[in-house]
Structure formats: C-alpha cells, structure tokens
C-alpha cells in the first residue's frame, strides 16, 4: 500500500464537514489514505460514509451552554474519548491528523499530541472555535480562511469549496446581456431560516409589482408549503423549492443572494463571485457569522443586515435601491476574495507535516 494515512477530524455542522470532504478528495487524488474521526449520532455519521471514507466515532457532545451535569462529567468523558482516539490512531497507523473543528476535534487532537503525531488545523470562521484555539498551541501548521482568525504567518488559505463552483465564469461574463428584473436567490441553509421565510415575502409585497425582483427561494426542510402559501397570500410571484440540489446553476443565474453568513456560504459566494445581503444567525457561537459577514462587507461585496434590524420595510427599502450594475460590482468584489486552491493547499500542508 502506498501513500500516507491521514485522520480528518470534523463534525457537528456542514461548515466543518464539507470543507474537510474537499480536503479528503485532494488527499485521495494524490494517492493517500483518509479516515475520519466524528461523533456518534451526528451529521457526519450520516454524510461521510456516502463518500467512501472510513468513519470512526467518539461518544462526545459539546459543552458550551449545556447543563451542569454534562460539565461535571467532562473530565471523565475527555479521558475516555482521548483514550479511544489514541486506539484509533494506532489501529490505522495515522501519520498526521487534520482538525477542522467541532466537538470531536479536541480529544482527537490531544490524542495525537500524546502520541507524537503531527497536527494540522484549519479554521473556517473569522472567529476561531474553541477546539481549534486549544489545538493551535500544539499544531505543526495552523491554517485559516479569514485573515484575523489566527496570526500564524503563511496560514491564510481560504475555505475549501467544490471545484464546480470555483470554475463558474467570472461575474462580468455571467452578467453580460442580462436585462429586466433582478434575479435574487434566497437560502437559509438546508434547514432554512424562518426569519427569511417570513420577511422576504412581506418585503416584496411592499414593492410595486414592476419593481419586484424575480425570486428563487429555498424554504428548508418541511417549510415549502407554508412559504409558498405566504407568497400566494401576498400576491407575490416566486419560485420556491424545499432544497436546491444544483447550487452551481443557482449561483450562476443569480444577480444577488440573501442568506446567512456561515463560513461555507461565504466561501461559496466568494468562489462564485456573488454579492449578498447577509443576515447573520444571531445565536452562532462567538457570533462568528457577524465576523464572517464583515469580511465581505469590508470588501464592498454586500450588505450586513443584523437580524434585529431585519424588517419587511427595511428589506423593501434595500431591494428597491438595488440595480444590476451595483450587483455586478459586488459580485466582482466578492470574486477578488476567493482563494480557489484552498483544498489543495491544506492537503499539501498536511502531506509536508507527515513527511
């Protein structure tokens, strides 16, 4: 068997899992072997095996904001999970671990540290998560997507995204020849965002019919019926779907996106070259979505609209002020932020550390 063996540690949310999958693809394309350390009863347990990657799991959940009983049990739980992670590392003869964040990353990283196995971390958000902050002290390489997440020199690599998104034509080429109403894409993540589902139809109803953009709105799981009913009741036309399976085409055809500001969303917007009205999820850990959004706004690639300020009237005012020229400018500015080789950069850093 040729190639080295890498253990990717990521879980909890798609924002950790999908960038790690992109790196896994890059490592395997180079002839290396990948296993995955995740949590039991988790999103990664459902997703990762579909990609043909061996999944090992630890019985661990997050502690921030949880009950006193779980916090009191933390030392015992950590001891158990570190021991189990050590067993997994030895079993697979892992030569380097790569941490992307999530509950499982810390015990996996600590196990690697105790065994003398090199650690690489990749931070997807503008504010580093708890696991990665701790592991950064021991990591051989600290990589990050946003300039201020860490101060380690040479670590800015961006967030890994799918190649078919990065390979979209540049904004000027996509926008060429477009006329008529703006085409706006609304996405609140796979589960949707209730506040967007409620406010966007109301805002459009406040605009004159000839000033309303053409909407393509992802409702999120289980919310399509109520969203379509709201649009219909307000007399607003919109194309609503529960889940968009072809995001590449959705990005290609849109002039603008209304969305949350998760790390993966920001990475895809910049890779595609699309401006956005960003409504950060207000309860994200360390309010990292607001910091993510500011990264785009400071580059004049969109607007930040805090959820506390999101009203139908405010959104209607913003939408009424937009034109395709402004959307194109935002899209071009977004594209300048893209780091399209991120997955390969992370993979190559890990390969060097395992040497």
UniProtKB/Swiss-Prot annotation:
Principal location listed in the UniProt entry: membrane
InterPro entries linked: GlcNAc_MurG, Glyco_trans_28_C, GlycoTrans_28_N
Classification via NCBIfam families: murG
Localisation per UniProt entry: Cell inner membrane
GO cellular component, one term: plasma membrane
GO biological process: carbohydrate metabolic process; cell division; cell wall organization; lipid glycosylation; peptidoglycan biosynthetic process; regulation of cell shape
Cited Pfam families: Glyco_tran_28_C (PF04101), Glyco_transf_28 (PF03033)
Keywords for the protein's UniProt record, in alphabetical order: Cell cycle, Cell division, Cell inner membrane, Cell membrane, Cell shape, Cell wall biogenesis/degradation, Glycosyltransferase, Membrane, Peptidoglycan synthesis, Transferase
Gene Ontology terms for molecular function: UDP-N-acetyl-D-glucosamine:N-acetylmuramoyl-L-alanyl-D-glutamyl-meso-2,6-diaminopimelyl-D-alanyl-D-alanine-diphosphoundecaprenol 4-beta-N-acetylglucosaminlytransferase activity; undecaprenyldiphospho-muramoylpentapeptide beta-N-acetylglucosaminyltransferase activity
Main EC class the enzyme belongs to: transferase
Amino acids binding UDP-N-acetyl-alpha-D-glucosamine: 13-15, 125, 162, 190, 244, 289
Listed pathway(s): Cell wall biogenesis; peptidoglycan biosynthesis
Protein name: UDP-N-acetylglucosamine--N-acetylmuramyl-(pentapeptide) pyrophosphoryl-undecaprenol N-acetylglucosamine transferase
Listed PANTHER family: GLYCOSYLTRANSFERASE (PTHR21015:SF22), UDP-N-ACETYLGLUCOSAMINE--N-ACETYLMURAMYL-(PENTAPEPTIDE) PYROPHOSPHORYL-UNDECAPRENOL N-ACETYLGLUCOSAMINE TRANSFERASE 1 (PTHR21015)
UniProt xrefs under HAMAP family: MurG
Function: Cell wall formation. Catalyzes the transfer of a GlcNAc subunit on undecaprenyl-pyrophosphoryl-MurNAc-pentapeptide (lipid intermediate I) to form undecaprenyl-pyrophosphoryl-MurNAc-(pentapeptide)GlcNAc (lipid intermediate II).
Enzyme Commission designation: 2.4.1.227
Membrane topology reported for the UniProt record: Peripheral membrane protein
Reactions the enzyme catalyzes: di-trans,octa-cis-undecaprenyl diphospho-N-acetyl-alpha-D-muramoyl-L-alanyl-D-glutamyl-meso-2,6-diaminopimeloyl-D-alanyl-D-alanine + UDP-N-acetyl-alpha-D-glucosamine = di-trans,octa-cis-undecaprenyl diphospho-[N-acetyl-alpha-D-glucosaminyl-(1->4)]-N-acetyl-alpha-D-muramoyl-L-alanyl-D-glutamyl-meso-2,6-diaminopimeloyl-D-alanyl-D-alanine + UDP + H(+)
Family statement: Belongs to the glycosyltransferase 28 family. MurG subfamily.
């Amino acid at each position: 068997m040729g190639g080295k063996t890498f253990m990717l540690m990521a879980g909890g949310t798609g924002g950790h899992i999908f960038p790690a999958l992109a790196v896994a693809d890059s490592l395997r394309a180079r002839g290396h072997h990948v296993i995955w350390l995740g949590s039991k009863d988790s999103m990664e347990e459902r997703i990762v095996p579909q990609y043909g990657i061996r999944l090992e799991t630890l019985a661990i959940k997050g502690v921030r904001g949880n009950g006193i009983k779980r916090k009191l049990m933390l030392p015992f739980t950590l001891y158990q999970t570190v021991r189990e992670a050590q067993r997994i590392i030895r079993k697979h003869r892992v030569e380097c671990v790569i941490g992307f964040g999530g509950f499982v990353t810390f015990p996996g990283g600590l196990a690697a540290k105790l065994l003398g196995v090199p650690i690489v971390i990749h931070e997807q958000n503008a504010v580093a998560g708890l696991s990665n902050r701790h592991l950064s002290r021991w990591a051989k390489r600290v990589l990050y997507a946003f300039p201020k997440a860490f101060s380690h020199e040479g670590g800015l690599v961006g967030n890994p995204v799918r190649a078919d998104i990065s390979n979209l034509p540049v904004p000027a080429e996509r926008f060429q020849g477009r006329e008529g109403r703006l085409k706006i894409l609304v996405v609140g993540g796979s589960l949707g965002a209730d506040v967007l589902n409620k406010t966007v139809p109301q805002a459009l109803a406040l605009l004159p019919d000839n000033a309303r953009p053409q909407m393509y709105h992802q409702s999120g799981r289980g919310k399509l019926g109520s969203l379509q009913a709201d649009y219909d009741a307000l007399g607003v036309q919109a194309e609503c779907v529960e889940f968009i399976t072809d995001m590449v085409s959705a990005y290609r055809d849109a002039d603008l996106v209304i969305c949350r500001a998760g790390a993966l969303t920001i990475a895809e917007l910049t890779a595609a070259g699309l401006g956005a009205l960003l409504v950060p999820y207000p309860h994200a850990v360390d309010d990292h979505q607001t910091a993510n959004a500011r990264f785009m706004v400071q580059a004049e690639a969109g607007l930040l609209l805090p959820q506390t300020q999101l009203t139908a009237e405010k959104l209607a005012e913003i939408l009424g002020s937009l034109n395709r020229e402004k959307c194109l400018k935002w899209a071009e500015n977004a594209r300048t932020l893209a780091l399209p080789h991120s997955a390969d950069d992370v993979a190559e850093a890990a390969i060097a550390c395992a040497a």
